[in-house]
């Protein structure tokens, strides 16, 4: 020990230690491997030396230093030391020490006194040893391909739970022990039982929603697109919302915005034309207009969004000339109906508009255009 410490101090400033110094360090570590009390001062001197990287390339020195660090509860430092050493040809003892250190780390984390074989296997898979400790790679624990095929053929064709005599025969044929054969078939049965359990969640998901694959994207109508109904014009969304909310009824009319106009029985059916209009103002307005220009003076009555056109009458100062008894009352479903005679008596001969609010210019010019087109088509 003293001679080693003396040589170590003499070659402290050298780039590489002499071969006899490395050999002496390895022999001392191998001799004191069972006596940690004497090994600890030697390990401390090696780790504090500037030549430690060269000394740790010796398998006995690396093994002694890692054991001392592990004994001092410095597992992380021991793992870093094993990762940094470059042992020629590797060392199975260093690989086993690497695994033992990680076993203790897992036991400390789980709070258990020992690990099961499965836990040790998972620990080795998660923490493989560095390539410097096993240059040829980890030794495969799997059976050869021919052995696995023979055992699998027996499980598929004969029995998955062979008897003791069958296991002994298989052990002789495959050069395995009866315990290895027993464990292989036990693992095979465990894997077969686990397959249906993995398939159940997918089958349940498919059974709960069988049309998930066939379901296409829902075709939704945009909220801004108008709806077209039979006998009605396109109605934008804002007008539908106003109809659902129900704006206050005008005292001049009680007709709904899309209800047909109640006509007197004296009106000839062939001379009466009902035209839907696009409502841009208040839907509850009532207008009586006398067309001009190419419409030949046709009379139009608009209630809500409907336009009723009638050929011109003889009396120029009134829109309608029938007497009150000849006019049919409005349907009883609408309280307080207003007859066309009452409206005509209070209106001038040219144009009168009676509504809750002033109709917009777009609606007025739209009505005039429809009036001209209807006059030209009917004329």
Swiss-Prot record:
GO terms for biological process: regulation of skeletal muscle cell proliferation; regulation of transcription by RNA polymerase II; skeletal muscle fiber development. GO terms for molecular function: DNA-binding transcription factor activity, RNA polymerase II-specific; RNA polymerase II cis-regulatory region sequence-specific DNA binding. The keyword NAD does not apply. Residues 195-283 are annotated as: Disordered. Its main location: nucleus. SMART domains: HOX (SM00389). One of its GO terms (cellular component) is transcription regulator complex. The lineage of its organism: Eukaryota, Metazoa, Chordata, Craniata, Vertebrata. CDD domains: homeodomain. It comes from Homo sapiens. Disulfide bonds: none annotated. The gene is ANHX. It is found in: Nucleus. Transmembrane segments: none annotated. The keyword Lipid biosynthesis does not apply. Residues 237-246 have a biased composition (Basic and acidic residues). InterPro entries: HD, Homeobox_CS, Homeodomain-like_sf, KN_HD, SIX1_SD. Coiled coil: none annotated. This is Anomalous homeobox protein. Keywords: DNA-binding, Homeobox, Nucleus. PROSITE patterns: HOMEOBOX_1, HOMEOBOX_2.
């Amino acid at each position: 020990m003293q001679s080693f410490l003396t040589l170590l101090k003499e070659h402290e400033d050298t780039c590489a230690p002499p071969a006899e110094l490395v050999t002496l360090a390895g022999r001392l570590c191998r001799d004191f491997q069972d006596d940690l009390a004497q090994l600890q001062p030697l390990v401390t001197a090696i780790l504090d030396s500037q030549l430690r990287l060269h000394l740790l390339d010796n398998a006995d020195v690396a093994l002694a230093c890692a054991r001392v660090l592990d004994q001092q509860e410095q597992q992380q430092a021991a793992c870093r030391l094993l990762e940094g050493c470059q042992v020629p040809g590797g060392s199975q003892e260093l690989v086993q020490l690497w695994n033992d250190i990680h076993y203790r780390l897992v036991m400390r984390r789980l709070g258990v006194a020992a690990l099961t074989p499965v836990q040790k296997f998972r620990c080795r898979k998660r923490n493989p040893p560095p390539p410097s400790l096993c240059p040829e790679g980890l030794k495969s624990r799997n059976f050869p391909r021919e052995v696995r095929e023979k055992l699998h053929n027996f499980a598929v064709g004969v029995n998955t739970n062979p008897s003791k005599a069958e296991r002994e025969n298989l052990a002789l044929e495959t050069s395995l022990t009866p315990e290895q054969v027993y464990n292989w078939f036990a693992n095979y049965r465990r894997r077969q039982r686990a397959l249906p359990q993995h398939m159940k969640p997918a089958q349940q998901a498919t059974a709960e929603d069988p049309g998930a694959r066939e379901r296409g994207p829902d075709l939704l109508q945009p909220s801004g697109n108008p709806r077209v109904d039979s006998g009605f014009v396109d109605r934008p969304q804002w007008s539908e919302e106003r109809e659902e909310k129900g704006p206050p009824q005008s005292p001049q009319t009680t007709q709904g915005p899309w209800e047909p106009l109640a006509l007197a029985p004296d009106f000839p059916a062939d001379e009466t034309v009902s035209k839907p209009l696009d409502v841009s103002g208040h839907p509850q307005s009532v207008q009586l207009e006398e067309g001009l220009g190419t419409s030949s003076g046709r009379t139009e009555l608009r209630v809500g969004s409907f336009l009723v056109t009638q050929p011109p009458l003889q009396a120029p100062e009134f829109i309608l000339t029938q007497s009150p008894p000849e006019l049919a009352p409005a349907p009883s479903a609408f309280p307080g109906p207003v007859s066309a005679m009452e409206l005509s008596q209070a209106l001038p001969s040219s144009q009168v508009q009676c509504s809750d609010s002033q109709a917009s210019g777009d609606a007025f010019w739209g009505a005039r255009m429809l009036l001209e087109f209807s006059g030209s088509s009917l004329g």
